[in-house]
Structures are given as structure tokens and as C-alpha cells.
């Protein structure tokens, strides 16, 4: 046990966390993640805030001059620095939204997309009669997530009906058609983190309005959508995410060549529910509220 703690502390001294220099609330998000990393490693770690206009090559050169073995890049700014050093250091990225598969070919990228298995288990608990889950997605961004979602749906006794859309016009057509033909008693609609197929004005307004009118469950990977009327969402537990990134960094330091590149879903989650929507769908609100950290509308 003491040896493990000593090893963790030693890693902390040779690890750097790089993140974008942003205002609140993002600064506090990164601070909580770093707190989790330090808690797991049992000591402070070097952290480096990088301005948006910083040259990744210059930042990478600064890091090369330090005695660093592992780099954790947070957000897109941190991921750019990780990419610049991927051939030299053990690197991983975390707290990243909407990752193209091409961006995750060289190192692991821990995204903010909630794990489909966690989302679908939550859906099954709230709406046990759900048999089919509809999803409209951009394959350049979310093909990896859809693969995981198909497996998760099978495990929950559901079928995933995923439609590809290359632009917002195609997404609107797909949503209009599926909302017109879906069976609200057995179908649900999932809004992923996908800027191509889910925008906060046209698409969200259409889906939430028609979902409400047809008594169909709409859940989302964006917690802000719950306030607008989506049934539920999962969102990051930032400190626990930091602890998980520290564990991944420990594995990476121990066996750099064993690291598997690619996008990974978020498993360190908290949950939000809209009880007005739940009541409208005939869900027992008192029972539904347990296990949710955020409840809308708030009293």
C-alpha cells in the first residue's frame, strides 16, 4: 500500500496537466478536475493554463525542457498540446466535447459524452416499456459512440435506430420523419452531443415540442436541455473525472506502449431530471427523483 502511494506521488512529480486559460465557469471545472487528479495521486501536480492564441509548438517546447513523463490535456486547448507531444511523451486528453475519430488516433481521449450504457439504464428505469431508441448523428463525430450504444441497447433489451445526417437540414428531415412515425409507448429519442445534428434553437425546439405533444420521452447528453424540457441527462462529476484521469495516467506511465488510442465515453456522472416532463409522461415523480442530483423545475 505504501509502495503504491509512493509510486502515485512520484508520478505526480513527473506529470503535467495542460488546460485552456478560460473564464468561469470553465476555470472552476478545470480546477475541480485537477483536485481529483491530485487527490488520487496523493500530492500536487504541475498544471499549465494555455492561452487560446498560444502556439502549441512553443508550449510543447517549454514542456520538453521539464522532467515530464506523462501529460494530461484538458479541453480542446489541452488536447492540441497532447497531440503536439504524442510521439514523445505518454499523453492522454480529457474533458473534450465532440471528438472526430481522426483526432483520437494517436492517444486516448476521454470525452464528455455520457456512456450510452449509463444513459440507457437510466431510461429503462424511468420508462421500462421502452423498446426502441432513436438517434440522429454525424458519423464523422459519433460513429464510435453509436457502436457502443448498439451494444448497450442490446444489453437493456432495446433496439437502437441510428440515422446518419451530414448537415442540419438532413438532421431536421430525419427528426421530422421519426417523430411522425414513432410509437410514444415504446419509442424514445436521444439527443447526443453532436453540433451537426443537435442545435439549441431549431432542432431542440422542434424535438422538445413534438416530443411533449406526442407524449414521447426525449433524453439528452446535454444537461442544459433538461431545463428546456428533456426528460433527463447525465453530466460530469468533475472531481471523479479527475480521479479517473489520474488512474488512466498511472496505467499509461506503467505501460506506455499498451495504451489504446481512441475516444472514450464519460462514466463519472451525475444526473438531472425534469419532473414536469416526467409527470407529463406518466412517470411516478416521487420515485423518479431519487438518484438525481439536479431536479428541474427547481422550487
Segments from the language model and where they lie:
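Extracytoplasmic "Venus flytrap"
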Residues: 13-33, 48-51, 194
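An alpha-beta-alpha
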Residues: 33, 112-156, 263-277
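Structural motif
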Residues: 45-65, 167-180
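Flexible loop/hinge segments that line or gate small-molecule binding clefts
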Residues: 87-116, 222-231
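Hydrophobic alpha-helical segments within soluble ligand-binding/sensing domains
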Residues: 99-102, 108-132, 236-256
